[in-house]
């Protein structure tokens, strides 16, 4: 019997079925599943007998596979060959949380059915979704290189619908406890309209990011970024929402560049960003705020970058959102965008930018981030806990090769594109209007600062990551951002 044939057949004629259906792909949805497959050839010869494809039936069953082409529930009998090879069949009326087994049965003109077990797939519908953006790094156009897939298919780039999916919210925090949520269009007020203490250094203005799963993978030139609202999916990582072995429902980032002093790092409106402080001391000053406080971490920064590229589908963040304060001469006070909504920007180089409630995510001052170190071989050492400035690999949770053999910098054309490497530089050969459109560098034995500062012009943006600082470097143009995890 030829490969792909089976004794599990029904029907008359010569009793020889077609070959199997291939490329069977099933995807779960909310109370439904979608299925694509490739039918057997229209005609084929097996043992000297001409076999002609007639139809393909799809049957499904809860908790166990259909045992024959008459068992289970009939979803469809396809009479047009390859009708569902690219346009998926949708099976509705399924129960979320129940595993369904779906069998595909091709039938020949003689009536023989191929019931080979390789044509069985399983799926568990749920009310969780997966949103995907594919980044083609061989396409220099920062907008057209990003295409949507899965639940993102058909969504509009830049739409506010994405904000509902991400679920982030501005809030007032004190000692690690949310005191209340802010009006997203006016940070000076709580949701109920009462005044919020955004200038009071006893409190901090933070942005709350609820738990979502993230996956960043690369195949060839394609970086695939996936986000799910499933809080526990083994196909995703939750590094931004964990501290060591402890899983977190939320992480919080300062709405502003970090303010305060050596007594306590803060996040308040109407203040001058704290600068001229080393990454070592910034981490210490955050710790002085209390248990759970840090400066923004690498995995949280990566998470925000992923949300950006999902929402805007454009690698040029200064074009998609705004230039940011990149044409000035000194650091500007916080709170300029309090009444500018959650995402704001303009073409002016002396205006401010705001992404997901985070003012000056690029421009104004650089932000040191913790949780990432490039060692002497440019391996990327990362962690979700015990943030510090140790240069010993044993002090870090993960170590991955960057693939970068010498110190490198320039406009980024290729990123690491992995769960542990995020969007750190891999190849720099672009410009301010092509590929990732931001400047980046990766040097040995260095810590990172991100975003860009007041004189960076079109080099700044959400993918600006400058891994070029020692543990003791301190400059007037480098600050940080508070985090609670």
For each predicted feature, which ranges?
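Enriched but not universal
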Residues: 1-25, 474, 481-485
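Pro/Thr/Ser/Gly-rich low-complexity, intrinsically disordered linker/stalk tracts
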Residues: 10-52, 96, 112-127
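GGW-centered surface loops in extracellular recognition modules
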Residues: 33, 127-208, 214-216, 293
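Solvent-exposed loop/turn segments flanking beta-strands in beta-repeat/beta-sandwich domains
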Residues: 40-73
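Short S/T/G- and acidic-enriched coil/turn segments that sit immediately N-terminal to beta-strands
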Residues: 84-90
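Beta-strand-rich modules
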Residues: 91-114
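C-terminal, surface-exposed recognition/capping segments
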Residues: 131-133, 299-302, 323-338, 344-345, ...
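Short aromatic-cysteine micro-motif
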Residues: 196, 200-203, 230-361
């Amino acid at each position: 019997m030829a490969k792909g044939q089976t004794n599990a057949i029904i029907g008359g004629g010569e009793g020889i079925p077609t070959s199997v259906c291939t490329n069977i792909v099933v995807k779960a949805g909310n109370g439904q599943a979608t299925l694509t497959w490739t039918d057997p050839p229209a005609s084929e010869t097996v043992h000297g007998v001409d076999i002609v494809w007639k139809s393909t039936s799809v049957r499904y069953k809860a908790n166990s596979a259909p045992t024959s082409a008459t068992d289970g529930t009939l979803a469809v009998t396809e009479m047009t060959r390859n009708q569902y090879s690219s346009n998926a069949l949708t099976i509705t009326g399924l129960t979320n949380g129940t595993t369904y087994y779906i069998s595909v049965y091709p039938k020949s003109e003689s009536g023989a059915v191929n019931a080979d077990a390789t044509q069985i797939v399983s799926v568990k519908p749920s009310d969780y979704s997966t949103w995907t953006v594919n980044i083609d790094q061989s396409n220099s156009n920062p907008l057209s290189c990003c295409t949507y897939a899965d639940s993102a298919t058909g969504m509009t780039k830049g739409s506010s619908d994405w904000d509902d999916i991400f679920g982030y919210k501005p809030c007032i925090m004190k000692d690690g406890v949310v005191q209340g949520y802010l009006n997203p269009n006016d940070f000076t007020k709580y949701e109920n309209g009462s005044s919020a203490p955004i200038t009071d250094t006893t409190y901090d203005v933070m942005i709350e990011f609820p738990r979502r799963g993230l996956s960043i993978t690369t195949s060839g030139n394609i970086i695939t970024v996936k986000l799910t609202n499933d809080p526990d999916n083994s196909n995703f990582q939750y590094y931004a929402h964990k501290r060591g072995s402890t899983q977190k429902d939320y992480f919080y980032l300062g709405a502003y560049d970090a303010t305060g002093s050596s007594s306590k790092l803060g996040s308040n409106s109407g203040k001058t960003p704290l600068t001229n402080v080393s990454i070592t001391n910034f981490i210490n000053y955050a710790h002085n705020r209390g248990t759970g406080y840090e400066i923004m971490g690498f995995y949280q920064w990566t998470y925000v970058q992923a949300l950006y590229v999902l929402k805007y589908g454009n690698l040029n963040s200064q074009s998609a959102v705004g230039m940011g304060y990149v044409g000035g001469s000194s650091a500007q006070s916080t709170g300029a965008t309090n009444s500018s909504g959650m995402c704001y920007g303009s073409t002016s180089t002396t205006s401010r930018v705001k992404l997901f409630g985070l003012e000056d995510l690029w421009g104004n001052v650089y932000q040191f981030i913790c949780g990432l170190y490039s060692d002497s071989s440019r391996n990327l050492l990362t962690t979700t806990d015990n943030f510090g400035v140790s240069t010993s690999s044993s002090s870090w949770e993960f170590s991955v090769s960057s693939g970068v053999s010498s110190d490198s910098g320039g406009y980024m054309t290729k990123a690491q594109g992995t769960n542990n490497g995020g969007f750190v530089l891999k190849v720099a050969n672009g410009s301010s209007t092509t590929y990732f459109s931001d400047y980046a560098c990766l040097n040995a034995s260095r810590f990172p600062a991100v975003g860009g500062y007041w004189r960076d012009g079109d080099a700044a943006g959400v993918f600006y990551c400058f891994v070029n600082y020692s543990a003791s470097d301190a400059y007037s143009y480098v600050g940080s951002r508070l985090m609670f995890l």
